[in-house]
Amino acid sequence: MKSVGLITEYNPFHNGHQYHINQSKKLTNADVTIAIMSGNFVMRGEPAIYNKFTRAKMALSTADLVIELPATASLSSGDHFAELAVKVADYMSVDTIAFGSENNNIKTLKQLAHSINEIEQSESFSQKVKEGKSYPRIISELLEHHEALASPNNILGISYLKAIAKHAKNINAISIKRENAQHHDSLIQHHKFASGTSIRTSIISQDDHWHHVVPKDIQHLYVTPHITLNQIFPYLKYQIIAMTTESLKNIYTVTEGFENRLKSYINEATDFHHFVKSLKTKRYTYTHIQRLLMNVLLNIKPTDVTRNIHAVKVLAMNDRGRQYLKHLKTVFPERQYITNINKSNAHYFTNEIKATHIYNAISGQQQTDFNTPVIQQYR
Protein backbone atom coordinates (compact mmCIF):
# COMPACT_ATOMS: atom_id res chain seq x y z
CA MET A 1 0.00 0.00 0.00
CA LYS A 2 1.35 3.41 -0.98
CA SER A 3 1.32 5.92 1.87
CA VAL A 4 1.60 9.67 2.31
CA GLY A 5 2.41 11.22 5.67
CA LEU A 6 1.39 14.62 6.98
CA ILE A 7 3.08 16.20 9.99
CA THR A 8 0.39 18.11 11.80
CA GLU A 9 -1.03 19.70 14.93
CA TYR A 10 -4.68 20.26 13.88
CA ASN A 11 -5.17 22.96 16.48
CA PRO A 12 -7.95 22.67 15.49
CA PHE A 13 -8.71 20.82 12.24
CA HIS A 14 -10.09 23.09 9.49
CA ASN A 15 -10.82 23.29 5.75
CA GLY A 16 -7.17 24.06 4.96
CA HIS A 17 -6.14 20.79 6.59
CA GLN A 18 -8.82 18.88 4.68
CA TYR A 19 -7.55 20.44 1.44
CA HIS A 20 -3.96 19.51 2.36
CA ILE A 21 -4.86 15.85 2.97
CA ASN A 22 -6.92 15.54 -0.21
CA GLN A 23 -4.26 17.22 -2.36
CA SER A 24 -1.52 15.08 -0.82
CA LYS A 25 -3.41 11.91 -1.64
CA LYS A 26 -4.17 13.12 -5.16
CA LEU A 27 -0.62 14.21 -6.00
CA THR A 28 1.02 11.04 -4.65
CA ASN A 29 -1.66 8.51 -5.67
CA ALA A 30 -1.48 7.23 -2.11
CA ASP A 31 -3.69 4.42 -0.85
CA VAL A 32 -3.52 5.64 2.73
CA THR A 33 -3.04 9.02 4.43
CA ILE A 34 -1.23 9.11 7.77
CA ALA A 35 -1.46 12.17 10.02
CA ILE A 36 1.36 12.42 12.56
CA MET A 37 -0.20 14.79 15.09
CA SER A 38 0.95 16.63 18.22
CA GLY A 39 -0.72 15.55 21.43
CA ASN A 40 -2.15 17.78 24.15
CA PHE A 41 0.58 20.43 23.94
CA VAL A 42 1.62 22.06 20.67
CA MET A 43 4.61 23.72 19.09
CA ARG A 44 3.36 27.24 19.81
CA GLY A 45 4.18 26.48 23.43
CA GLU A 46 0.64 26.14 24.70
CA PRO A 47 -2.02 23.51 25.37
CA ALA A 48 -3.98 22.44 22.30
CA ILE A 49 -7.39 24.10 22.26
CA TYR A 50 -9.04 20.65 22.17
CA ASN A 51 -7.57 17.47 23.58
CA LYS A 52 -5.76 15.02 21.33
CA PHE A 53 -8.67 12.57 21.20
CA THR A 54 -11.12 15.19 19.94
CA ARG A 55 -8.60 16.48 17.39
CA ALA A 56 -7.83 12.92 16.22
CA LYS A 57 -11.53 12.37 15.70
CA MET A 58 -11.69 15.59 13.66
CA ALA A 59 -8.76 14.42 11.55
CA LEU A 60 -10.34 11.02 10.91
CA SER A 61 -12.99 12.80 8.86
CA THR A 62 -10.35 12.98 6.09
CA ALA A 63 -7.21 11.06 7.11
CA ASP A 64 -7.00 7.26 7.42
CA LEU A 65 -4.59 6.98 10.37
CA VAL A 66 -3.72 9.42 13.15
CA ILE A 67 -0.47 8.78 15.04
CA GLU A 68 0.59 10.75 18.12
CA LEU A 69 3.85 12.68 17.86
CA PRO A 70 6.04 12.34 20.99
CA ALA A 71 5.24 15.10 23.50
CA THR A 72 8.82 16.35 23.70
CA ALA A 73 8.90 16.93 19.93
CA SER A 74 6.13 19.52 20.19
CA LEU A 75 7.99 21.34 22.97
CA SER A 76 11.32 21.50 21.14
CA SER A 77 12.87 23.59 18.38
CA GLY A 78 11.59 23.25 14.83
CA ASP A 79 14.53 21.03 13.88
CA HIS A 80 13.93 18.55 16.71
CA PHE A 81 10.18 18.62 16.02
CA ALA A 82 10.91 17.80 12.38
CA GLU A 83 13.50 15.14 13.23
CA LEU A 84 11.15 13.16 15.47
CA ALA A 85 8.22 13.58 13.09
CA VAL A 86 10.31 12.23 10.20
CA LYS A 87 11.47 9.33 12.38
CA VAL A 88 7.83 8.51 13.19
CA ALA A 89 7.02 8.68 9.47
CA ASP A 90 9.90 6.30 8.76
CA TYR A 91 8.66 3.94 11.52
CA MET A 92 5.26 4.01 9.78
CA SER A 93 6.99 3.17 6.47
CA VAL A 94 5.69 6.38 4.87
CA ASP A 95 6.62 6.74 1.20
CA THR A 96 6.16 10.51 0.90
CA ILE A 97 5.84 13.39 3.34
CA ALA A 98 3.61 16.21 2.11
CA PHE A 99 3.87 19.57 3.85
CA GLY A 100 2.22 22.92 3.30
CA SER A 101 4.27 25.97 2.39
CA GLU A 102 3.87 29.49 1.07
CA ASN A 103 6.75 29.01 -1.35
CA ASN A 104 5.59 25.70 -2.91
CA ASN A 105 8.91 25.32 -4.75
CA ILE A 106 10.40 22.10 -3.44
CA LYS A 107 13.65 22.64 -5.37
CA THR A 108 14.23 26.04 -3.73
CA LEU A 109 13.38 24.67 -0.29
CA LYS A 110 15.81 21.76 -0.74
CA GLN A 111 18.56 24.18 -1.76
CA LEU A 112 17.85 26.29 1.32
CA ALA A 113 17.93 23.19 3.53
CA HIS A 114 21.38 22.32 2.15
CA SER A 115 22.62 25.90 2.60
CA ILE A 116 21.38 26.07 6.20
CA ASN A 117 23.11 22.79 7.03
CA GLU A 118 26.38 24.34 5.82
CA ILE A 119 25.76 27.61 7.69
CA GLU A 120 25.20 25.78 10.97
CA GLN A 121 28.73 24.37 10.68
CA SER A 122 30.37 27.74 9.96
CA GLU A 123 32.43 30.02 12.22
CA SER A 124 30.08 32.92 11.41
CA PHE A 125 27.17 30.98 12.88
CA SER A 126 29.10 30.24 16.09
CA GLN A 127 30.10 33.89 16.42
CA LYS A 128 26.54 35.15 16.08
CA VAL A 129 25.37 32.65 18.70
CA LYS A 130 27.99 34.10 21.06
CA GLU A 131 26.59 37.57 20.30
CA GLY A 132 23.29 36.42 21.76
CA LYS A 133 21.23 36.44 18.58
CA SER A 134 18.29 34.07 18.12
CA TYR A 135 18.58 31.14 15.71
CA PRO A 136 15.96 32.48 13.22
CA ARG A 137 17.71 35.86 13.10
CA ILE A 138 21.14 34.29 12.54
CA ILE A 139 19.94 32.11 9.67
CA SER A 140 18.09 35.02 8.11
CA GLU A 141 21.19 37.23 8.28
CA LEU A 142 23.58 34.63 6.89
CA LEU A 143 21.21 33.78 4.05
CA GLU A 144 20.89 37.49 3.25
CA HIS A 145 17.28 37.61 4.43
CA HIS A 146 16.02 35.12 1.86
CA GLU A 147 12.31 35.86 1.35
CA ALA A 148 11.31 32.21 1.82
CA LEU A 149 12.36 32.45 5.47
CA ALA A 150 9.70 35.07 6.19
CA SER A 151 6.96 32.44 6.45
CA PRO A 152 6.80 29.85 9.25
CA ASN A 153 5.56 27.00 7.06
CA ASN A 154 8.50 27.40 4.69
CA ILE A 155 10.88 27.33 7.66
CA LEU A 156 9.28 24.17 9.03
CA GLY A 157 9.31 22.61 5.57
CA ILE A 158 13.04 23.24 5.36
CA SER A 159 13.43 21.50 8.74
CA TYR A 160 11.56 18.46 7.37
CA LEU A 161 13.85 18.35 4.34
CA LYS A 162 16.95 18.58 6.56
CA ALA A 163 15.63 15.72 8.72
CA ILE A 164 14.79 13.55 5.71
CA ALA A 165 18.27 14.07 4.26
CA LYS A 166 19.86 13.08 7.56
CA HIS A 167 17.58 10.35 8.93
CA ALA A 168 15.31 8.94 6.21
CA LYS A 169 16.68 9.31 2.70
CA ASN A 170 14.15 6.72 1.52
CA ILE A 171 11.26 9.16 2.09
CA ASN A 172 10.22 11.52 -0.70
CA ALA A 173 8.87 15.01 -0.03
CA ILE A 174 6.37 17.25 -1.79
CA SER A 175 5.16 20.74 -0.99
CA ILE A 176 1.55 21.91 -1.26
CA LYS A 177 0.81 25.62 -1.47
CA ARG A 178 -1.20 27.06 1.39
CA GLU A 179 -4.51 28.50 0.26
CA ASN A 180 -5.51 32.10 1.12
CA ALA A 181 -5.07 32.27 4.90
CA GLN A 182 -1.65 33.10 6.32
CA HIS A 183 -0.25 31.35 9.37
CA HIS A 184 -0.46 34.36 11.71
CA ASP A 185 -3.80 35.84 10.55
CA SER A 186 -5.67 36.74 13.74
CA LEU A 187 -9.11 37.18 12.15
CA ILE A 188 -11.13 35.03 9.75
CA GLN A 189 -10.98 36.91 6.45
CA HIS A 190 -12.03 34.29 3.91
CA HIS A 191 -15.26 32.38 3.36
CA LYS A 192 -13.55 28.97 3.13
CA PHE A 193 -10.00 29.05 4.52
CA ALA A 194 -8.62 30.56 7.73
CA SER A 195 -5.55 30.26 9.93
CA GLY A 196 -5.57 28.19 13.09
CA THR A 197 -4.91 31.40 15.06
CA SER A 198 -8.05 33.09 13.73
CA ILE A 199 -10.18 29.98 14.30
CA ARG A 200 -9.00 29.66 17.90
CA THR A 201 -9.76 33.36 18.43
CA SER A 202 -13.26 32.83 17.04
CA ILE A 203 -13.91 29.78 19.22
CA ILE A 204 -12.63 31.45 22.40
CA SER A 205 -14.65 34.58 21.59
CA GLN A 206 -17.73 32.37 21.17
CA ASP A 207 -18.71 33.88 17.82
CA ASP A 208 -19.85 31.73 14.90
CA HIS A 209 -17.33 32.80 12.24
CA TRP A 210 -15.43 29.51 12.56
CA HIS A 211 -18.48 27.64 11.18
CA HIS A 212 -17.54 28.72 7.65
CA VAL A 213 -13.99 27.39 7.70
CA VAL A 214 -14.26 23.91 9.23
CA PRO A 215 -15.82 20.81 7.63
CA LYS A 216 -19.57 20.74 8.20
CA ASP A 217 -19.76 17.06 9.12
CA ILE A 218 -17.52 17.53 12.18
CA GLN A 219 -18.73 20.90 13.47
CA HIS A 220 -20.38 19.16 16.42
CA LEU A 221 -16.90 18.36 17.75
CA TYR A 222 -16.04 22.06 18.13
CA VAL A 223 -18.55 22.62 20.91
CA THR A 224 -16.65 20.30 23.25
CA PRO A 225 -14.70 21.88 26.16
CA HIS A 226 -11.56 23.77 25.21
CA ILE A 227 -8.58 25.07 27.16
CA THR A 228 -6.65 28.37 27.08
CA LEU A 229 -3.39 29.80 28.38
CA ASN A 230 -5.27 31.76 31.03
CA GLN A 231 -6.34 28.46 32.58
CA ILE A 232 -2.75 27.20 32.52
CA PHE A 233 -1.08 30.18 34.21
CA PRO A 234 -1.99 29.59 37.90
CA TYR A 235 -0.61 26.04 37.68
CA LEU A 236 2.54 27.27 35.94
CA LYS A 237 3.04 30.03 38.50
CA TYR A 238 2.72 27.55 41.35
CA GLN A 239 5.23 25.22 39.69
CA ILE A 240 7.86 27.94 39.25
CA ILE A 241 7.43 29.25 42.80
CA ALA A 242 7.53 25.75 44.30
CA MET A 243 10.58 24.55 42.35
CA THR A 244 14.09 25.46 43.44
CA THR A 245 16.35 27.39 41.10
CA GLU A 246 18.47 24.26 40.72
CA SER A 247 15.41 22.20 39.75
CA LEU A 248 14.41 24.80 37.15
CA LYS A 249 17.95 24.72 35.78
CA ASN A 250 17.47 21.01 35.05
CA ILE A 251 14.33 21.50 32.95
CA TYR A 252 14.58 20.74 29.22
CA THR A 253 15.38 23.89 27.13
CA VAL A 254 16.25 25.99 30.22
CA THR A 255 19.78 27.24 29.53
CA GLU A 256 22.23 30.06 30.26
CA GLY A 257 20.78 31.09 33.58
CA PHE A 258 17.21 31.43 32.35
CA GLU A 259 16.06 29.77 35.57
CA ASN A 260 17.03 33.00 37.36
CA ARG A 261 14.79 35.06 35.07
CA LEU A 262 11.90 32.72 35.81
CA LYS A 263 12.37 33.20 39.55
CA SER A 264 12.90 36.97 39.23
CA TYR A 265 9.72 37.75 37.32
CA ILE A 266 7.17 35.15 38.41
CA ASN A 267 5.92 36.84 41.58
CA GLU A 268 4.96 40.06 39.78
CA ALA A 269 3.33 38.33 36.81
CA THR A 270 -0.46 38.56 36.69
CA ASP A 271 -1.12 36.52 33.57
CA PHE A 272 0.66 34.31 31.06
CA HIS A 273 1.24 36.92 28.34
CA HIS A 274 2.55 39.51 30.83
CA PHE A 275 4.97 36.93 32.18
CA VAL A 276 6.26 35.91 28.74
CA LYS A 277 6.87 39.55 27.77
CA SER A 278 8.86 40.12 30.96
CA LEU A 279 11.07 37.12 30.14
CA LYS A 280 11.87 38.14 26.55
CA THR A 281 15.50 38.59 25.51
CA LYS A 282 17.08 39.06 22.08
CA ARG A 283 18.42 35.50 22.18
CA TYR A 284 15.05 33.78 22.55
CA THR A 285 11.86 34.10 20.53
CA TYR A 286 8.48 34.31 22.26
CA THR A 287 7.65 30.84 20.98
CA HIS A 288 10.84 29.37 22.44
CA ILE A 289 10.00 30.91 25.81
CA GLN A 290 6.46 29.55 25.72
CA ARG A 291 7.70 26.04 24.91
CA LEU A 292 10.20 26.34 27.76
CA LEU A 293 7.34 27.25 30.12
CA MET A 294 5.33 24.21 29.04
CA ASN A 295 8.39 22.06 29.78
CA VAL A 296 8.42 23.60 33.27
CA LEU A 297 4.71 22.89 33.68
CA LEU A 298 5.20 19.26 32.64
CA ASN A 299 8.51 18.93 34.52
CA ILE A 300 10.28 17.65 31.40
CA LYS A 301 14.01 17.05 31.89
CA PRO A 302 16.66 16.45 29.21
CA THR A 303 16.72 12.77 30.18
CA ASP A 304 13.00 12.55 29.33
CA VAL A 305 13.51 13.70 25.76
CA THR A 306 12.84 11.13 23.08
CA ARG A 307 15.57 10.79 20.45
CA ASN A 308 14.49 7.58 18.74
CA ILE A 309 11.17 5.89 18.07
CA HIS A 310 10.62 2.56 19.84
CA ALA A 311 6.81 2.51 19.59
CA VAL A 312 3.98 4.64 18.21
CA LYS A 313 0.55 5.36 19.64
CA VAL A 314 -2.34 5.07 17.18
CA LEU A 315 -4.97 7.64 18.14
CA ALA A 316 -7.46 6.98 15.33
CA MET A 317 -7.98 4.83 12.25
CA ASN A 318 -10.66 3.98 9.71
CA ASP A 319 -10.96 0.71 7.78
CA ARG A 320 -8.24 1.71 5.32
CA GLY A 321 -5.96 2.73 8.17
CA ARG A 322 -6.62 -0.56 9.94
CA GLN A 323 -5.72 -2.46 6.78
CA TYR A 324 -2.44 -0.52 6.48
CA LEU A 325 -1.62 -1.15 10.14
CA LYS A 326 -2.20 -4.87 9.63
CA HIS A 327 0.17 -4.72 6.66
CA LEU A 328 2.86 -3.00 8.76
CA LYS A 329 2.58 -5.56 11.55
CA THR A 330 3.15 -8.31 9.00
CA VAL A 331 6.17 -6.62 7.41
CA PHE A 332 7.67 -5.36 10.69
CA PRO A 333 6.61 -7.84 13.40
CA GLU A 334 9.21 -6.46 15.83
CA ARG A 335 7.76 -2.94 15.78
CA GLN A 336 5.29 -1.66 18.37
CA TYR A 337 2.14 -0.19 16.82
CA ILE A 338 0.03 0.43 19.92
CA THR A 339 -3.72 0.97 19.61
CA ASN A 340 -4.57 0.73 23.31
CA ILE A 341 -2.29 1.66 26.20
CA ASN A 342 -2.08 -0.65 29.21
CA LYS A 343 0.41 -1.49 31.96
CA SER A 344 2.53 -3.64 29.66
CA ASN A 345 3.22 -0.89 27.10
CA ALA A 346 2.74 2.36 29.08
CA HIS A 347 6.51 2.73 29.57
CA TYR A 348 6.82 3.74 25.92
CA PHE A 349 4.59 6.77 26.46
CA THR A 350 5.49 8.18 29.88
CA ASN A 351 5.65 11.81 28.72
CA GLU A 352 2.43 11.61 26.72
CA ILE A 353 0.52 10.02 29.60
CA LYS A 354 1.77 12.67 32.03
CA ALA A 355 0.91 15.49 29.61
CA THR A 356 -2.64 14.14 29.31
CA HIS A 357 -3.06 13.91 33.09
CA ILE A 358 -1.88 17.50 33.56
CA TYR A 359 -4.05 18.72 30.68
CA ASN A 360 -7.03 17.03 32.34
CA ALA A 361 -6.20 18.40 35.79
CA ILE A 362 -6.35 21.93 34.38
CA SER A 363 -9.31 21.49 32.01
CA GLY A 364 -11.43 19.17 34.15
CA GLN A 365 -11.68 16.65 31.31
CA GLN A 366 -11.67 12.89 31.88
CA GLN A 367 -10.31 11.19 28.73
CA THR A 368 -6.96 9.50 29.42
CA ASP A 369 -4.64 7.26 27.45
CA PHE A 370 -5.94 4.31 29.47
CA ASN A 371 -9.71 4.84 29.25
CA THR A 372 -9.91 6.00 25.63
CA PRO A 373 -9.66 3.20 23.04
CA VAL A 374 -8.44 3.87 19.53
CA ILE A 375 -10.96 6.09 17.71
CA GLN A 376 -12.57 4.42 14.71
CA GLN A 377 -15.28 6.86 13.64
CA TYR A 378 -15.75 10.62 13.76
CA ARG A 379 -19.52 11.04 13.69
Curated annotation (Swiss-Prot):
Cellular localisation: Cytoplasm
Job of this protein: Catalyzes the formation of N(4)-acetylcytidine (ac(4)C) at the wobble position of elongator tRNA(Met), using acetate and ATP as substrates. First activates an acetate ion to form acetyladenylate (Ac-AMP) and then transfers the acetyl group to tRNA to form ac(4)C34.
Enzyme Commission number(s) of this protein: 6.3.4.-
Enzyme class: ligase
GO biological process: tRNA modification
The protein's name: tRNA(Met) cytidine acetate ligase
Domain of life of the native organism: Bacteria
Chain segments annotated as transmembrane: none
Keywords: ATP-binding, Cytoplasm, Ligase, Nucleotide-binding, RNA-binding, tRNA processing, tRNA-binding
Gene Ontology MF annotations: ATP binding; ligase activity, forming carbon-nitrogen bonds; tRNA binding
Keyword Iron included in the entry's annotation: no
Family to which the UniProt record says this protein belongs: Belongs to the TmcAL family.
Reactions this protein catalyses: cytidine(34) in elongator tRNA(Met) + acetate + ATP = N(4)-acetylcytidine(34) in elongator tRNA(Met) + AMP + diphosphate
HAMAP family: TmcAL
GO cellular component: cytoplasm
Residues the record lists as binding ATP: 7-20, 100, 153, 178
Primary gene name: tmcAL
InterPro entries found in the cross-reference section: Rossmann-like_a/b/a_fold, tRNA(Met)_cyd_acetate_ligase
